[in-house]
Amino acid sequence: MAMYQNMLVVIDPNQDDQPALRRAVYLHQRIGGKIKAFLPIYDFSYEMTTLLSPDERTAMRQGVISQRTAWIHEQAKYYLNAGVPIEIKVVWHNRPFEAIIQEVISGGHDLVLKMAHQHDRLEAVIFTPTDWHLLRKCPSPVWMVKDQPWPEGGKALVAVNLASEEPYHNALNEKLVKETIELAEQVNHTEVHLVGAYPVTPINIAIELPEFDPSVYNDAIRGQHLLAMKALRQKFGINENMTHVEKGLPEEVIPDLAEHLQAGIVVLGTVGRTGISAAFLGNTAEQVIDHLRCDLLVIKPDQYQTPVELDDEEDD
């Protein structure tokens, strides 16, 4: 069965060009499925109009929602006229990330696409607070779309964790590879590469233990990672030349390799840890994301549960 058959596109309210919608249509043309163009809006000034009755406030909100709905319809007109099934939904909500995740849950959406803004000079992608909330808390995969065309022959680079002895990391590695291969086969037979980073010898160990041999330690760590990568690639029938085990910090290794390969997308897993307030993306993942210059797909483990709940009832 084809993946991503119920896509939610987060519309950027500040520009007419919508790269995330364009990417969703690109996927639709190759794998089918439905698209919902979704925009949460809020204007505090409308809440300050104490002279208005609740009915008048509701009417004002509804007027803004109608205006924005018509505006999105105009953005999507070309696709709609071409027969692409796009539903448009605008809601009034003062926390955009909550509105998006609630829509994902209530609508059963299996992929969220959102535009990632770029720093003009650095070309690096800049993530907003809403982006980070989605990457940390959205139960469905989140695809951050860079405002550039998909590179010709763009590859998919899957970042895997080869060091951990935790069983959930193995399951997540396999999920990342499996889903990326499935998607790649359906979208232009995209080439899939795997990357794992391993740490360099801590300098303080070499200083404190004179008999410690850094080269032996490095060889052992590298060997461990190579064996783990071999097992993973063999499970999915991936050629050795499509796998990369590199020495260094993940936040340097992964973006550098993505650039070297001219990757169109980096696929990354994040592990949810309940009880650790909003910090469960993990420093490593966040630093990797901060250095990327291409699209990003973030996937959670199967057992992940979002801390965001559906509202009991609509606000007045």
Curated annotation (Swiss-Prot):
CDD domains: USP-E_repeat1, USP-E_repeat2. Signal peptide: none annotated. Keywords: Cytoplasm. Induction: During growth inhibition caused by the exhaustion of any of a variety of nutrients (carbon, nitrogen, phosphate, sulfate, required amino acid) or by the presence of a variety of toxic agents. Positively regulated by guanosine 3',5'-bisphosphate (ppGpp) and by a RecA/FtsK-dependent regulatory pathway. Pfam families: Usp. Its main location: cytoplasm. It is found in: Cytoplasm. One of its GO terms (cellular component) is cytoplasm. One of its GO terms (biological process) is response to stress. GO terms for molecular function: small molecule binding. It comes from the Bacteria. The keyword Cytoplasm applies. PANTHER family: UNIVERSAL STRESS PROTEIN E (PTHR47892:SF1). Belongs to the universal stress protein A family. Required for resistance to DNA-damaging agents. This is Universal stress protein E. It comes from Escherichia coli (strain K12).
